[in-house]
Amino acid sequence: MTIEERLVPLLHHLNEVGLIGPNAFKFGGPDELLLVSGGPASHLAKASMLCGPSRRRLVVRQPKIQPSAPHSPSKGDVRLTSQTSQLVGHIEEWKHGCWYHATTIFDETLAGVLEKLQAFSTQTEFEGTPLPALPKRPFWSGCLAYDLVQWTQPLTLQHPPEEGTILCVLFFVERYLAEDKSTGELHAFSIKGDDWSQRVGSELSQAQEK
């Protein structure tokens, strides 16, 4: 049985005991992030991960941009231009049961914003010994919209997203539960001083004994 097949009861139980989701507000936000390595176990699919509550996130929204004049790239009419609106990322931190704005980073390119995001990361390694294929220290993960192409290529969209539309949400993952696809074993990891992994491990042990 894989983590995908166990997902619903596992998420429900960890939510009930306050280790993920809305009930885990002491650890971080209610957002749930699952990184599934699909297919059979192989050198390309070694582990799946359920990320624990995050205490920091990056949110990027669509700024107000003047649409490009009508043209047809499919007919060879490709119009290159320099993006004049900077990409703005809002760093938010989880405090007192809510997300609060902490600071803002901005750049002319997506790569530039992601590079500046390194200043809000940490080099502290996870306790325990994660599988070779798994992260050894906290990392950023989440969703990026295709419309971010506005800051990766010299293009102006004819139909850009509405102003304020969310283009990117990245969570800083400082704790996670991983499934070794070759053995089916589950292991929880977190940084020093964080008992989240111990609590998850205890819940898993109790579940196996039942």
Please identify what each model-predicted range represents.
Residues 110-129, 153-164:
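Short acidic (Asp/Glu) patches
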Residues 127-135, 141:
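Acidic low-complexity segments
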Residues 1-104, 139, 143-210:
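Extended accessory regions or peripheral subdomains of proteins
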